[in-house]
């Protein structure tokens, strides 16, 4: 009763949340945080990174001590000469090629930006306009059988009044009877569908924070070993720490691709009889509701005299159930699910990759210019680190566009 009292009447609902009770509540929370707060979190990260840069540049604050960094372009020039390449122009004529130049670096801006991103991602919904959401555990009475049955029968009406249906998707979503019940209600009402794979948000967080930790590890090495340390030490530290988030992202991409293939196979072979339900007594309630939604014109399908088999257990209309199964296998519901997943690799979006690149690399580029003199190595490094993610982002968008039209 106390849980049901948390709900309130509404004429219109922004979000109808469909989920499996067996899935982790933390994963569902993170999925919703990424859906609602990711853009706000990225903007907050970039703004805080730029503000930190301006304050550090002005000398008004100091967050981390500076460590000596390599003269990247001079080292590159020496490597070219050592390999036998002799460019027709003298690279040493450029100010950033001064062999005596000693850049310094501290990942202050990136640390501030990443912290802002994580905080706003997890708590940003408290700063935005309220969103009305249908959550079955709260909006359907769980202890009074009559009120529970009335709420179940009215699910399609909740969806009619909902602008969008969000599906917290995991591999077993289409194996859960109640999830299929909500999907059937959506099919009968025509609401928009959007899939939220539950592992997407943890991957974005782990990869983004992982790259920041990698840069901090590089900084700690430079701070204690300095440029005069082991020539290969920085490379070993950098590769080791960058490998963790990189391999994690690759592993998730493979997992997401398999998840998409399984989703395609599940939709192709979908049958309501293969679904599972914690309480067996709920099955007849659910199937009767689906029967009423998919009966011709909203009425039960008329049965020819002497026919048998049109009605299954507890008066369930098997033809109506078959209509719903056909809709999932190849009808409008099938097309909406496939459209929501998209043609990107697996269930990983280009948007998530761009989110990681811009939130990590732009503040990182600013860190190289905090003590720059306007003519030296930092400004060039800043320019290249700033431009590279843009080029990478555009290439991802082009690949996604080609995949979508092919």
Task: Locate the predicted segments by residue.
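The feature represents the membrane-entry module of six-transmembrane cation channels
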Residues: 1-406
């Amino acid at each position: 009763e106390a849980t049901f009292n948390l709900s309130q009447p509404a004429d219109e609902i922004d979000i109808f949340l469909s989920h499996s009770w067996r899935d982790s509540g933390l994963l569902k929370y993170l999925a919703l945080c990424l859906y609602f707060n990711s853009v706000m979190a990225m903007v907050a990260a970039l703004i805080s990174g730029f503000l930190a840069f301006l304050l550090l540049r002005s000398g008004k604050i100091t967050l981390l001590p500076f460590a000596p960094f390599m003269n990247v372009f001079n080292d590159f020039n020496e490597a070219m000469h050592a390999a036998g390449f002799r460019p027709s122009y003298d690279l040493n004529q450029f100010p950033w090629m001064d062999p005596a130049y000693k850049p310094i670096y501290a990942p202050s801006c990136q640390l501030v930006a990443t912290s802002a991103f994580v905080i706003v991602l997890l708590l940003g919904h408290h700063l935005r306009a309220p969103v009305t959401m249908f959550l079955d555990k709260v909006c359907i009475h769980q202890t009074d059988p009559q009120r529970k049955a009335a709420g179940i029968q009215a699910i399609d009406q909740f969806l009619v009044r909902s602008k969008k249906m969000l599906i917290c998707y995991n591999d077993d979503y289409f194996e859960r009877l109640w999830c299929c019940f909500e999907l059937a209600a959506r099919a009968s009402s025509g609401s928009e569908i959007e899939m939220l794979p539950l592992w997407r948000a943890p991957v974005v967080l782990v990869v983004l924070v992982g790259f920041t930790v990698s840069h901090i590890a590089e900084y700690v090495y430079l701070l204690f070993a300095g440029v005069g340390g082991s020539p290969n030490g920085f490379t070993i530290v950098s590769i080791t720490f960058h490998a963790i988030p990189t391999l994690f992202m690759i592993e998730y991409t493979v997992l997401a691709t398999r998840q998409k293939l399984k989703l395609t196979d599940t939709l192709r072979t979908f049958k309501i009889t293969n679904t599972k339900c914690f309480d067996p007594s709920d099955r007849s309630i659910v199937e009767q509701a689906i029967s009423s939604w998919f009966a011709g014109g909203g009425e039960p399908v008329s049965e020819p005299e002497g026919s048998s088999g049109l009605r299954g257990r507890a008066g369930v209309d098997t033809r109506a159930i078959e209509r719903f199964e056909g809709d999932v296998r190849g009808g409008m519901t099938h097309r909406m699910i496939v459209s929501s997943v998209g043609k990107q690799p697996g269930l990983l979006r280009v948007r998530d990759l761009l989110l990681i690149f811009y939130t990590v690399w732009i503040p990182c580029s600013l860190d190289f210019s905090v003590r720059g003199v306007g003519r030296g190595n930092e400004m060039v490094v800043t320019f290249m680190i700033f431009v590279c993610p843009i080029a990478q982002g555009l290439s991802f968008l082009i690949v996604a566009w080609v995949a979508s039209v092919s």
